[in-house]
Amino acid sequence: MAKDIKFSEEARRSMLRGVDTLANAVKVTLGPKGRNVVLEKKFGSPLITNDGVTIAKEIELEDAFENMGAKLVAEVASKTNDVAGDGTTTATVLAQAMIREGLKNVTAGANPMGLRKGIEKAVTAAIEELKTISKPIEGKSSIAQVAAISAADEEVGQLIAEAMERVGNDGVITLEESKGFTTELDVVEGMQFDRGYASPYMITDSDKMEAVLDNPYILITDKKISNIQEILPVLEQVVQQGKPLLIIAEDVEGEALATLVVNKLRGTFNVVAVKAPGFGDRRKAMLEDIAILTGGEVITEELGRDLKSATVESLGRAGKVVVTKENTTVVEGVGSTEQIEARIGQIRAQLEETTSEFDREKLQERLAKLAGGVAVIKVGAATETELKERKLRIEDALNSTRAAVEEGIVAGGGTSLMNVYTKVASIVAEGDEATGINIVLRALEEPVRQIAINAGLEGSVVVERLKGEKVGVGFNAATGEWVNMLESGIVDPAKVTRSALQNAASVAAMFLTTEAVVADKPEPNAPAMPDMGGMGMGGMGGMM
């Protein structure tokens, strides 16, 4: 296929038009008085959002060169979202400022490689200073403040703070759509996995359609049980103890399932069978997690164990097990704390090594189930459009809060970027490197300027006053007052600010050092089909 090629100034100008188109659409959402953007959807109602990365992903431009520029900045938003989960609009604003300022200098004859060096030096210094001024997050109220700022909703802030308090920092907090109008929190204590009872005849509570086992023994195996003789020895031992039994196996079927159901209905013993969660290697790992949590063993041929040799000593124990049609929850497993801690450490090590987003999510879930529990925030709203928008905001707030727990908090509203201004300005450099540093200095002002503009104020006036203020004092765009940002609860996670700056600088440096751009040539439109008017089939009338 033929290609279009543009060089130097012409190439960069075309891409800059794309950068500006995307960034201008995204930056109207910045700050407490930022506006929304409406996105057309092929199916269903339009999506109304103020989430930078969601807007950036939707933008596709007709001109191939402009589109490349737009996609580069969308990459900044996307990468920041992957690393920190929030701050995508800030990252976009920073990238646009660095690219525009840099391009002016390249056009005036500056060497792009020198500019790149200066940009990298400035960003390294800014990040070091951010680490110095960040404060560790302490207590439920600090967590609530971070979440409330991100979601622009105090009620959401309180919900997220409560969820994190209940399940711990390692706990899993998921979002679901609620059937009602209100947003509420539902916490599942203990370990839950998505497998229900093998037969509805096993339930103990017909109103709730669930089976509740108090102080049960738990048989854990990766084998399929189809013959009752295989588990008869261990079954007899459990009956003698007078305790209920939970069987977690690859499957329980045929004669084995029929015998268990008949004896359950007769009242001989209380037993519930469920399928093992997960698939393949993940199934083995999850069964091992359950075994460690309950102090039992996984009965598997890989370890030379078969079901006939199982005894009550090899079974797990728990304070309570609740089995519904779709889920099984094990509460108060009696496993040893040392073993559980060791397992958690093992999963954390795997988390650090994995590069797959899917694996990371699954490992995080396993970690949460062992460490604390799972909290579900059920998001409610009056309309579907509002529900989608609210869900996106809560997701950002959740990510922000996790980032704050990880690396601490800094003054919000773009103030922290201005607080590192002096440190960056003090770097000694010459020539194009010094110009590169000035590009970053100009970009550091941009988020505050944009927040002020969105609040209907003159951005440059706010920026100039902020340069003279003490560290931590900033402009509250919601009220129009100058306040101590940390004391007023206007905070950003340091990780979000750091990621936004790093990713923006990375793409800006790549952009400025671009000398040629190659794109597919648009294909000429195919000629229209000829008129088919003369090809009537009247002569075929006799074939009826």
Curated annotation (Swiss-Prot):
It catalyses: ATP + H2O + a folded polypeptide = ADP + phosphate + an unfolded polypeptide. It is an enzyme of class 5 (isomerase). GO terms for molecular function: ATP binding; ATP-dependent protein folding chaperone; isomerase activity; unfolded protein binding. InterPro entries: Chaperonin_Cpn60_CS, Cpn60/GroEL, Cpn60/GroEL/TCP-1, GroEL-like_apical_dom_sf, GROEL-like_equatorial_sf, TCP-1-like_intermed_sf. It comes from the Bacteria. The keyword NAD does not apply. ATP binds at T29, L30, G31, P32, D86, G87, T88, T89, T90, G413, N476, A477, A478, D492. One of its GO terms (biological process) is protein refolding. Keywords: ATP-binding, Chaperone, Cytoplasm, Isomerase, Nucleotide-binding. CDD domains: GroEL. Its EC number is 5.6.1.7. It is found in: Cytoplasm. One of its GO terms (cellular component) is cytoplasm. The keyword RNA-binding does not apply. Together with its co-chaperonin GroES, plays an essential role in assisting protein folding. The GroEL-GroES system forms a nano-cage that allows encapsulation of the non-native substrate proteins and provides a physical environment optimized to promote and accelerate protein folding. Belongs to the chaperonin (HSP60) family. Forms a cylinder of 14 subunits composed of two heptameric rings stacked back-to-back. Interacts with the co-chaperonin GroES. This is Chaperonin GroEL. It comes from Bacillus cereus (strain B4264).
